[in-house]
Amino acid sequence: YSILMNNKEKTKERILDALPQLQCKKCTYKDCESYANAIIFDNEKLNKCEPGSSHTEKQISNILNKNIKVIESNEIKDFPIAKITVEECIGCTICIKVCPVDAIIGARHKQHFIIDDQCNGCELCITECPVDCMEMIPNEEKNSWKWPGAQANISKKLYNEKLIRTHRIKE
């Protein structure tokens, strides 16, 4: 039993490496690791990662040795990042709380700002902003949702650091 679990854990890590690590919840799971767990342990569909598109679905099917037909998408989306219209920002801090990678800085009742290099384009801040002062804009440096491994690793690292920090605050 432990050998089977060990193999499943290794497979889960490989799936996690294939996911873009946006932590965007578009797959309906709270984060990429939860989705990877669902694929391994609950036989979840492989096509639920919208940002990863067919590219990620194909990688995961190869990891699982599943011979599924993946509909290739030639469409390359602009890689968006969030932008705050600072004059309209009320400093509510909601965006700071929902950002999975701590890419937003600011204080209560003060203007907030996006750290462009850290923003992974998850759009969680956009949907939560109560005054609609945020928008997604193209990031010229990153022109596709198909993140290379280095960017995904940075996003995963920032997310894990936020989890550790927020867990310490709650204690």
Regions found by a protein language model. Name each.
Residues 23, 31, 87-88, 118:
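Short pre-active-site segment immediately N-terminal to redox-active cysteine/selenocysteine motifs
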Residues 40-46, 50, 108, 114-117, ...:
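Short cysteine/histidine-rich metal-coordination sites, predominantly Zn2+-binding motifs
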Residues 26-38, 94-113, 124-141:
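Iron-sulfur cluster-binding cysteine motifs and their immediate structural context
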Residues 49-94:
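Long amphipathic N-terminal alpha/beta scaffold segment
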Residues 21, 86, 101, 116, ...:
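Aromatic-flanked redox-active Cys/Sec active sites in thiol-based oxidoreductases
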Residues 11-18, 29-64, 135-139:
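Iron-sulfur (Fe-S) cluster-binding segments and ferredoxin-like electron-carrier domains
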Residues 2-23:
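General detector of N-terminal leader/presequence modules that precede the first folded domain
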Residues 5-11, 72-73, 116-171:
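Flanking helices and flexible, charged tails adjoining ferredoxin-like Fe-S electron-transfer domains
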